[in-house]
From Swiss-Prot:
Substrate binds at residues 163, 192, 249. Gene3D superfamilies: 3.40.50.880. It comes from Bacillus licheniformis (strain ATCC 14580 / DSM 13 / JCM 2505 / CCUG 7422 / NBRC 12200 / NCIMB 9375 / NCTC 10341 / NRRL NRS-1264 / Gibson 46). Transfers an acetyl group from acetyl-CoA to L-homoserine, forming acetyl-L-homoserine. Pfam families: HTS. This is Homoserine O-acetyltransferase. InterPro entries: Class_I_gatase-like (IPR029062), HST_MetA (IPR005697), MetA_family (IPR033752). The gene is metAA. The active site is at 142 (acyl-thioester intermediate), 235 (proton acceptor), 237.
Length: 302
């Protein structure tokens, strides 16, 4: 079954051009199937780009999936057209009484701020608490993962002396975990962050399990033992060119930035990005959707 998205969502045309099976709401209505309901709290500035990246990761699912896009009501996005937000997004007050099979909380480029300095922090705390009783499993990405670990377990982020930036090799720590089923022992994930999570702090929380780590990029994949919370410190959803765009952006701002590690390959026309992560990224999202969401969610929420 395909992902089920609004007929006018910009991502629809992009995904269809990539041969990813999508279905609009009108067609999905005629299928006598209970779709999975996933809410995406999109905290990234370029919301349309992030929507497309996440929907691409979930687009090969055999399950029919319906998406609700969420933004904080206490923050006004500056990089997404107002019309798009009004047409496709909602706020927490309109969904707080609903139950969802899964939730994705994206990253946000606000690592330099303390959590309490973030304009929507109190609202995010409320959403995180709500997710424990209204969502089967929540996937937190990058800053969203750090914020979730801080809120739920009191684990603080640690400022790095140098930005972790590039595509890094990771190894599986728990080979029998459902979330990494089908993975090779080593796989790649893009990272782009100035802060990290300390492994000793994670080990001190008995309710958490570390599923993969990198010698260079640190801890990557963490899950709660009840599988209701997943924390991903990298960006497996990134497009091939995303790190390149971030690198060129920072150069244009005259920032000190090294080229992303293990990312560019010299070709006849100069250095070009190489995508080493897409297959495992898709598998990770599929495993989360199948094992942590579909296999665990009730057919009828009470």
């Amino acid at each position: 079954m395909p992902i089920n998205i609004p007929i006018n969502l910009p991502a629809k045309q992009i995904l269809e051009s990539e041969n990813i099976f999508v279905m609009d709401e009108k067609r999905a209505f005629h299928q006598d199937i209970r779709p999975l309901n996933i809410v995406i709290l999109n905290l990234m500035p370029q919301k349309i780009k992030t929507e497309t990246q996440l929907l691409r990761m979930l687009g090969n699912s055999p399950l029919q999936v319906y998406f609700t896009f969420l933004i904080p009501s206490t923050h006004t996005p500056k990089h997404t057209p107002r019309q798009h937000l009004e047409q496709f997004y909602t706020t927490f007050s309109s969904i707080r009484d609903r139950k969802f099979d899964g939730m994705i909380i994206t990253g946000a480029p606000i690592e330099h701020l303390e959590y309490e300095e973030v304009s929507y922090w109190e609202e995010l705390r409320e959403i995180l608490d709500w997710s424990k009783t209204h969502v089967t499993s929540t996937l937190h990405i990058c800053w969203g993962a750090q914020a979730g670990l801080y809120h739920h377990y009191g684990i603080r982020k640690v400022k790095l002396p140098k930005k972790t930036f590039g595509v890094f090799e990771h190894r599986i720590m728990e080979k029998n975990e459902r979330l990494v089923r089908g993975f090779e022992e080593f796989y790649y994930v893009p990272h782009s962050r100035h802060t990290d999570i300390n492994m000793d702090d994670l080990k001190a929380v008995s309710h958490l399990k570390v599923l993969s780590i990198s010698d260079e990029a640190g801890v990557c994949l963490i899950a709660s033992k009840d599988e209701k919370q997943v924390f991903l410190t990298g960006h497996p959803e990134y497009d091939t060119d995303t790190l390149k765009e971030e690198y060129e952006r920072d150069l244009a701002r005259n920032m000190e930035i090294d080229p992303p590690v293990n990312y560019f390959k010299e070709g006849p026309d100069g250095a070009v990005p190489v995508n080493r992560w897409k297959a495992h990224a898709t598998l990770l999202f599929m495993n989360w959707l199948n094992y942590y969401v579909y296999q665990e969610t009730p057919y009828e929420w009470k």
